[in-house]
Amino acid sequence: MSESGHSQPGLYGIERRRRWKEPGPGGPQNLSGPGGRERDYIAPWERERRDGSEETSTAVMQKTPIILSKPPAERSKQPPPPAAPAAPPAPAPLEKPIVLMKPREEGKGPAATTSTSTPEGTAPPPPAAPVPPKGEKEGQRPTQPVYQIQNRGMGTAAPAAMDPVVGQAKLLPPERMKHSIKLVDDQMNWCDSAIEYLLDQTDVLVVGVLGLQGTGKSMVMSLLSANTPEEDQRAYVFRAQSAEMKERGGNQTSGIDFFITQERIVFLDTQPILSPSILDHLINNDRKLPPEYNLPHTYVEMQSLQIAAFLFTVCHVVIVVQDWFTDLSLYRFLQTAEMVKPSTPSPSHESSSSSGSEEGAEYYPHLVFLQNKARREDFCPRKLRQMHLMIDQLMAHSHLRYKGTLSMLQCNVFPGLPPDFLDSEVNLFLMPFMDSETESETPPRAGPGSSPLFSLLPGYRGHPSFQSLVSKLRSQVMSMARPQLSHTILTEKNWFHYAARIWDGVKKSSALAEYSRLLA
C-alpha cells in the first residue's frame, strides 16, 4: 500500500501475503489511520452500503471508516457526512429502496440511520441489511419493555385475540333463580338439579327454617330471599299455603326446597315438622311404610328428625318459626334433633375453644326464634323480657348458638329501651301480622267532637311497620358469621356434595334407628 492510502494492484495477490510476514514496528498500531489493516477489513462493508447508490465518490469511501471507528461520543458531535445529499439523485430503478430509507434519516440525521431504523422499520423490514440488526437491537431497548408489560398485563389470551363472546360471558352475573326447586322430594330422596345454579366460590351463607304446620315458614323465607310484602303471594319464590289448603288443613311444602340469591345466600324451606296433615295422608292413602317403621306417627316423627338433624349440620343459620308463645313439644323436638345430629369436625380451633370445652369437635349453627303473627301486647317490654327469660331457661342445656348473634334492641326496634334491659337476651325476633299492615294504614274516622287533625294520623300499632321489621330481620340474618361447616373450606358446589353425603348419612344413622326402636 502506498503512502497516500490507495491500494496497489497486487494488494490481494502474492504481495499481500508477503506483507503479512514482514516484521513491523512493535507496540500499538493505529488501525484506523492510513495504511492500517482496518482499511482492508472495512472495504467489503462499504460495498454493501453502496447497494443503494452507484455514484458515490471516492472521498465518501475514505471518510466512512473514520466515522465508524471513532467512539460513539465523538461520532455524535461530528457533522453529518455528505452521503445524505447524494441519496436523492438516485437512478429510477432504485427509487423505491431510497424512499424506504428516507424515513430513517429524518429521525436523527444521516449518522443515526442504523440506530433509528428500528421503531419505524419493524413493520416493513428492509430486505438487504445484514449489518444494521445490531443497531436495531440497541434501538429497541427503550421501547421493548413497554410491549412486554402490555402483553403481560393482558394475560395469556391477549396475543391470541380473545373471543368477545367468551369475554362477556365471564363478566355476566350468575343465572338468577326465579322460583325454588327441590333439594329433597316428598319421598325423601336427594335431587341433583340444584347444582346447576352453584359456583366455585366460598363466600356462601346457608339459611334453613323449621316450624310447625301453618306458621308461615315459606312466607318468611320468601320475604328474606327475593320478595317484598307488596308483591302477590302467588309470585313468591317459596309457594305459600293457599286459602284452599288452609281450609283443608293440608301442608303446602313437602320435602326440602332450595333457592339461592344473587348475593350467594342459600335458603332451604322445609315441610312442617310433626305435621298432622302428613300423618293423615299416610293413614288414609294406605301408603306403605319403610320396613324399619311399624307405625305411621313414628315415621312422621323420624322424617322430622331427619330434616332437623340435616339442617343442624349443613346450615349456618336455622330459623325456628312459631305463631304463638309457646309450644313445649317444639323445644323437646329441638333437643332430640340435636342429640341425633351427625357428628362433624369443628370448623377451627379458635371457635371450638371459644364456644366451650364441652362441645368438643361438634359444629352447631346459629338458632333464631321467630315469633310470627305477633300481637300488639307481645311488643310490650315486660312481655318481651318474659319471653327471653323462658327461652333461655328451656335452651339452657343446649349447645346450639341460640343467643348472642341477633338482637331487637340493637336494630332500634325499641328505641326507648337501654341495651342492658334484657338480662339474658336470646336470638328472638317478633314479626306482626302481614295483613294488619294494610288495615292500619286506613286512617280512622274522626269523631263528632274530635279534632280533624287526628283523622290524618295513622292508627297506633304498638310496633314498627311490617316492611321495616322484615328489612331489619334480613339485615341481621345476612350479617351473621359464616363459620366453616367442615374441617376444610367449602365452595358452593363442595357444599352441595357435602350436604348430599350428610343426607345419606342421616337416613342411615344408627342413632336415629335406635331412637325409632325406642318410640315403638
UniProtKB/Swiss-Prot annotation:
Residue numbers carrying N-acetylserine:
2
Q: Where is this chain compositionally biased, Low complexity type?
A: 109-121
Q: Which residues form a coiled coil?
A: none
Q: Keyword annotations for this protein?
A: Acetylation, Nonsense-mediated mRNA decay, Phosphoprotein
* Bias (Pro residues): 78-94, 122-133
**Ranges where the record places region Disordered:** 1-143
**Posttranslational mods:** Phosphorylated by SMG1.
- Please give a single GO biological process term from the UniProt record: brain development
Q: Which residues carry this modification: Phosphoserine?
A: 2, 4, 7, 32, 53, 451
Give the family this protein belongs to, as stated in its UniProt record.
Belongs to the SMG9 family.
Q: How does it assemble?
A: Self-associates to form homodimers and forms heterodimers with SMG8; these assembly forms may represent SMG1C intermediate forms. Component of the SMG1C complex composed of SMG1, SMG8 and SMG9. Self-associates to form homodimers and forms heterodimers with SMG8; these assembly forms may represent SMG1C intermediate forms. Interacts with DHX34; the interaction is RNA-independent.
Please identify the protein, giving its name as recorded.
Nonsense-mediated mRNA decay factor SMG9
User: Which gene name belongs to this protein?
Assistant: SMG9
